[in-house]
């Protein structure tokens, strides 16, 4: 049992991060503190001063832990990382949270690749972005591909390496085939340098040079060549124009404001570049009615800019935010020059911030209207389902199960959950089949259902024994209806498992036609046809598609992992860490097999003996 009095007594008077957990060991809140002992103790004192949300959270705290840091800045960075990792229930959650795309140039390779990624890392490569307009980044990439025949493969290609056969892209003029040795590193890098200059938007010499070439071609009556150069100039100018919207310069600004109703809120960001509003983003934030605006905006800024590579010089907000000095310091370190957070009192900037707030209100109203509309449609479908099955109440929580394997190999089971007609991803569960050998879907289904309800009963008993407030654990909430993707056989398996545990839950299955399309439901040994295109059929299709997707995705990930690791596990001197480093560097077994000694030695953790072991294994 966690000793709160003792743990509160020994809290250090240092900066750090505290992690609150519920009775099931789940992280429900992550916070930072300038002085840990002062901040954490506040939660367990003077509850009258706490908001309703904080009081609800404190009731669910079964234990806490903390991590001491050297500074408040380190605590802020760690807090951001842990919130992203755990998505705790009581932290502010951005409903439309997203990682913006970047254009990445792998400049640490001899023959770099250029592609779109949503993962920004300090790995020595060049990143351009983030692009808040997802369409624009792919338009830019499309233009780059037209202009520059670069490689798109993940091969580890080094200058002077063993040449391989050129792929189809070479034969259709989309790649210069560095893999086959048809282009030198210096020639290839001329294209890369040109792309970097275009994306930077700082070098106009390329266009000047091309215009001279175009004029020369026209003078020599090479009109086809001149037309191609003209098209190239237009494409480069178009890229440069699009880049202006996403390149943060010295005078660029972001405007952030928040609108809340009686429960939820919407944070709106306007991006101002060269004095013009070039883009905007909005994020829905749930259950913040009791939270002070300064706290919400502070948390929002830390989360929003924590995942982006570029930060404007000035951020305008409606009022001073919590930990403003610390947040400014955090953003300044990320940007590499001073960042200011300001509150405009009058003039154009105040007017623009008012516009941001008005737009936040509009977006929140639209979001709520859409939610109401979806809620009505889902309620109608659930009402129809309850009527069809003769249930006493609406099946608010539906659990669906599926099995995925290839001839019994890497057999997995998955459970997806729909609450009030909407997918509830946080409650999805997946199972590796342990007791069944070979392709036996019925027994595999029996295993995962037995494990699911066994865990559920254990959790319920634990909560009751400790007299704790009922908490949303991994399995303790039981469904109102179980929907089996299969027919009568799977339904009977589910009913047998429930009977063994003494649980009464209605179970239905899905009936397919000769084209394997769902045509109805089987319930109590009776087949019930469902009208195609009805709200109920649309709901069933959503559930069915989701459980299939989740099962296949999990099965594929296990299969790929097994395939990649099985060969490397047989190589002497190659442990788990080295296997991981090899796969991160080369991407595939085939690339590792083809790698030279120099390439292998360039891999973190691979010494001469390990490299020799790899070469010997693949040559034998």
Swiss-Prot record:
Subcellular location(s) of the protein: Cytoplasm
Q: Keywords, A to Z? A: Cytoplasm, DNA damage, DNA excision, DNA repair, Excision nuclease, SOS response
Task: Tell me the disulfide pairings in this chain.
Answer: none
The record places domain UVR at 204-239
Q: Which GO terms describe its cellular component?
A: cytoplasm; excinuclease repair complex
- Please provide, alphabetically and separated by semicolons, the GO molecular function terms listed in this UniProt record: DNA binding; excinuclease ABC activity
A Gene Ontology biological process noted in the UniProt record is: SOS response
GIY-YIG domain location is 13-92
User: What is the role of this chain?
Assistant: The UvrABC repair system catalyzes the recognition and processing of DNA lesions. UvrC both incises the 5' and 3' sides of the lesion. The N-terminal half is responsible for the 3' incision and the C-terminal half is responsible for the 5' incision.
Family membership noted in the UniProt record? Belongs to the UvrC family.
Q: How does it assemble?
A: Interacts with UvrB in an incision complex.
Q: What is this protein called?
A: UvrABC system protein C
Q: Could you tell me the gene encoding this protein?
A: uvrC
């Amino acid at each position: 049992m966690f000793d709160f009095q003792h743990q509160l007594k020994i809290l250090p008077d240092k900066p750090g991060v505290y992690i609150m957990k519920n009775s099931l060991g789940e992280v429900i809140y992550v916070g930072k503190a300038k002085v840990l002992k002062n901040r954490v103790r506040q939660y367990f004192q003077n509850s009258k001063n706490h908001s309703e949300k904080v009081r609800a959270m404190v009731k669910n705290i079964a234990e806490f832990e903390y991590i001491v840091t050297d500074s408040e800045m380190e605590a802020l960075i760690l807090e951001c990382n842990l919130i992203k990792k755990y998505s705790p229930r009581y932290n502010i959650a951005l409903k439309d949270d997203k990682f913006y795309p970047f254009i990445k140039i792998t400049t640490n390779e001899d023959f770099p690749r250029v592609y779109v990624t949503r993962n920004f890392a300090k790995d020595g490569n060049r990143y351009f972005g983030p692009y808040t307009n997802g369409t624009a980044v792919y338009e830019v990439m499309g233009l780059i591909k037209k202009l520059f025949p670069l490689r798109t493969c993940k091969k580890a290609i080094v200058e002077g390496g063993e040449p391989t056969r050129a792929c189809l892209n070479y034969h259709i003029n989309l790649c210069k085939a560095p893999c086959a040795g048809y282009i030198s590193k210096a020639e290839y890098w001329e294209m890369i340098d040109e792309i970097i200059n275009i994306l930077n938007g700082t070098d106009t010499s390329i266009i000047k040079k091309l215009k001279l070439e175009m004029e020369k071609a026209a003078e020599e009556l090479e009109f086809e060549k001149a037309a191609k150069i003209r098209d190239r100039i237009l494409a480069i100018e178009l890229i440069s124009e699009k880049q202006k919207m996403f390149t943060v310069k010295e005078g660029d600004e972001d405007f952030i404001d928040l609108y809340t109703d009686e429960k939820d809120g919407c944070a709106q960001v306007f991006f101002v570049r060269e004095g013009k509003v070039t883009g905007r983003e909005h994020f829905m934030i749930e259950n913040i009615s009791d939270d002070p605006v300064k706290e919400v905006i502070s948390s929002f800024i830390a989360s929003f800019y924590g995942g982006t590579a570029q930060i404007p010089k000035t951020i305008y907000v409606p009022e001073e935010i919590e930990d403003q000095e610390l947040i400014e310091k955090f953003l300044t370190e990320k940007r590499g020059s001073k960042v200011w957070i300001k509150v405009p009192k009058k003039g154009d900037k105040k007017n623009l911030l008012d516009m941001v707030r008005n737009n936040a209100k509009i977006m929140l109203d639209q979001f709520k209207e859409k939610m109401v509309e979806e809620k009505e449609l889902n309620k109608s479908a659930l009402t129809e389902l309850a009527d069809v099955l003769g249930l006493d109440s609406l099946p608010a929580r539906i659990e669906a199960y599926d099995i995925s394997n290839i001839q019994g190999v890497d057999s997995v089971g998955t459970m997806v959950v729909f609450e009030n007609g909407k997918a509830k991803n946080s409650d999805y569960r997946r199972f590796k089949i342990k007791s069944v050998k070979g392709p036996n879907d019925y027994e595999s289904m029996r295993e995962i259902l037995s494990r699911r309800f066994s865990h559920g009963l254990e959790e319920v008993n634990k909560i009751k024994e400790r007299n704790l407030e009922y908490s949303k654990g991994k399995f303790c909430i039981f469904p109102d209806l179980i929907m089996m993707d299969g027919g009568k056989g799977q339904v009977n398996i589910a009913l047998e498992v429930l009977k063994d545990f003494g649980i009464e839950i209605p179970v239905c299955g899905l009936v397919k036609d000769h084209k394997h399309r769902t045509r109805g439901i089987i319930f109590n040994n009776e087949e019930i046809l469902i009208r195609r295109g009805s709200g109920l059929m649309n709901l069933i299709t959503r559930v069915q598609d989701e459980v299939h997707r989740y099962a296949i995705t999990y099965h594929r990930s296990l299969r790929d992992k097994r395939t990649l690791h099985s060969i490397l596990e047989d190589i002497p001197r190659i442990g788990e860490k080295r296997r991981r480093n090899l796969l991160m560097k080369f991407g595939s077994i085939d690339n590792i097999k083809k790698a030279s000694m120099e390439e292998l030695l360039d891999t973190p953790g691979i010494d001469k003996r390990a490299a020799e072991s790899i070469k010997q294994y693949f040559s034998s």
